[in-house]
């Protein structure tokens, strides 16, 4: 079915690596001519339906009728890629909310610290804990709690920019990472506080959940669940992720101790 077709007929214009397909394939063929064989991953585009298919391609230099030729064998990697994506998601994302987990949060915080050191800009971490979560679980069970946590994740995601991160650390604890906020402490503090206030406002709105119990008609419940927020800025010279998170955590507990449903700012050392 592919007889007479060129690589640009069988590939998207750009590979997942970001390289243009045609010149990249030429580079691979040059390797084959030199080494005799080359194996690589390639995104193919099906001729019949235009869908892209991940594949492993092995190209070997051969002789055909006493003339040099190349033989390509192709293995479909779709199932393997789906499996790898599942493993990646289990490793880096919270199963309940689909938010980044603690491990991915620390990866992104480390990247943010490196960027902050290069750019001279401040970042911020907002640590939050829900104020009235346990009574919901006690009264209505874990299904209601799970539904509320999922909604908390959605509300938090709407409060931040695309380049920022919301992660679930576990239980009813979440953390927000704001990157390259501003190049001076005063402006960065003001901007980060605006985000924290938006979070405080959005999480304080009533939660309405539908519980479907044992096949019966769904029962709607309404619950109020504010949050206590601890916020800290990290300057360009800081490099300890654990210290930053502990500082935000202490500020969060200070907010709890001062009556809940508020923001406390940890001073930058």
Predicted segments with their positions:
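Terminal output helix/cap of sensory domains in signal transduction proteins
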Residues: 4-43, 193
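PAS/PAC sensory module
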Residues: 38-43, 49-58, 71, 228
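Sensory beta-strand/linker motifs that couple input domains to effectors
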Residues: 73, 126
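PAS-associated C-terminal cap
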Residues: 75-88
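Conserved long alpha-helical elements within nucleotide-processing catalytic cores of c-di-GMP signaling
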Residues: 88-92, 98-124, 131-161, 167-171, ...
């Amino acid at each position: 079915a592919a007889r007479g077709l060129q690589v640009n007929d069988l590939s998207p214009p750009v590979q997942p690596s970001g390289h243009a397909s045609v010149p990249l394939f030429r580079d691979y063929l040059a390797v084959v001519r030199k080494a005799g064989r080359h194996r690589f991953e390639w995104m193919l585009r099906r001729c019949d339906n235009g869908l892209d298919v991940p594949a492993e391609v092995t190209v070997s230099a051969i002789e055909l009728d006493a003339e040099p030729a190349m033989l390509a064998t192709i293995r479909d990697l779709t199932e393997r890629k789906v499996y790898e994506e599942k493993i990646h998601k289990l490793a880096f994302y919270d199963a309940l909310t689909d938010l980044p987990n603690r491990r991915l949060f620390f990866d992104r915080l480390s990247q943010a610290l490196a960027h902050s050191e290069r750019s001279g800009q401040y970042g911020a971490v907002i640590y939050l804990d829900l104020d009235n979560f346990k009574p919901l679980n006690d009264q209505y069970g874990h299904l209601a709690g799970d539904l509320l946590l999922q909604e908390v994740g959605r509300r938090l995601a709407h409060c931040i920019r695309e380049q920022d991160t919301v992660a679930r650390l576990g239980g009813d604890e979440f953390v927000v990472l704001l990157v390259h906020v501003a190049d001076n402490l005063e402006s960065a503090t003001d901007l980060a506080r605006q985000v924290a206030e938006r979070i405080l406002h959005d999480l304080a709105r009533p939660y309405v959940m539908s519980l479907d119990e044992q096949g019966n008609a769904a029962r709607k419940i309404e619950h109020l669940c504010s949050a206590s927020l601890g916020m800290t800025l990290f300057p360009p010279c800081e490099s300890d992720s654990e210290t930053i998170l502990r500082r935000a955590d202490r500020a969060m507990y200070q907010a709890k101790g001062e009556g809940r449903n508020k923001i406390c700012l940890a001073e930058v050392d």
